[in-house]
C-alpha cells in the first residue's frame, strides 16, 4: 500500500490501520474496505475473488458509496437526537449496519470521512469490534 496514490487525502498509515482493524475483526468474511469523503472514495481492500479489475470494483462500488455519503448530512439530526433532553437517551451515533440477503454493509462515520465494510453473512457481534477499532483510528487522525 505504501506510495499508493489516493483520490482522498488518506495517508498510507491510516489506510493500513483501517484494513488491519477490519481484517483482524472480520477475517475471511471481509469482502471490501472503502474509505470515503463527501466527494471521493478509495478502495483500501478488495477480496481477490470478487472483481476482475480495480476499475470494475470502482464502478460497482460507486453507487453504494454515493448512497452512503448521505450519512454526512444526517450528522446534525443524529447529534440532536442523541443529545435531546428526554426519556429516550440513546447516546451518540456509532455506526450503521445494513442487512442484505447474502451479507452486510457497515458504515462508520467520523467528522467528514467514512469507512464502508462489505461482509459475507456472519455473526453480527464482530461488527462492533471492527467499527470501534476503525472509529478510534479515524478519531485520532
Language-model regions, residue ranges each:
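Non-catalytic interaction/Regulatory regions outside core domains
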Residues: 1-141
Amino acid at each position: 500500500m505504501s506510495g499508493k496514490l489516493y483520490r482522498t487525502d488518506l495517508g498510507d498509515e491510516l489506510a493500513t490501520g483501517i484494513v488491519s482493524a477490519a481484517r483482524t475483526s472480520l477475517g475471511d468474511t471481509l469482502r471490501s474496505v472503502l474509505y470515503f469523503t463527501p466527494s471521493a472514495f478509495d478502495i483500501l481492500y478488495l477480496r481477490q475473488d470478487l472483481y476482475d479489475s480495480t476499475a470494475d470494483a470502482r464502478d460497482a462500488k460507486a453507487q453504494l458509496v454515493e448512497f452512503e455519503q448521505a450519512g454526512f448530512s444526517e450528522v446534525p439530526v443524529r447529534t440532536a437526537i442523541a443529545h435531546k433532553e428526554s426519556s429516550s437517551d440513546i447516546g451518540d451515533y456509532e455506526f450503521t449496519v445494513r442487512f442484505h440477503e447474502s451479507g452486510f454493509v457497515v458504515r462508520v462515520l467520523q467528522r467528514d470521512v467514512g469507512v464502508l465494510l462489505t461482509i459475507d453473512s456472519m455473526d453480527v457481534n464482530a461488527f462492533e469490534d471492527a467499527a470501534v477499532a476503525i472509529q478510534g483510528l479515524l478519531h485520532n487522525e
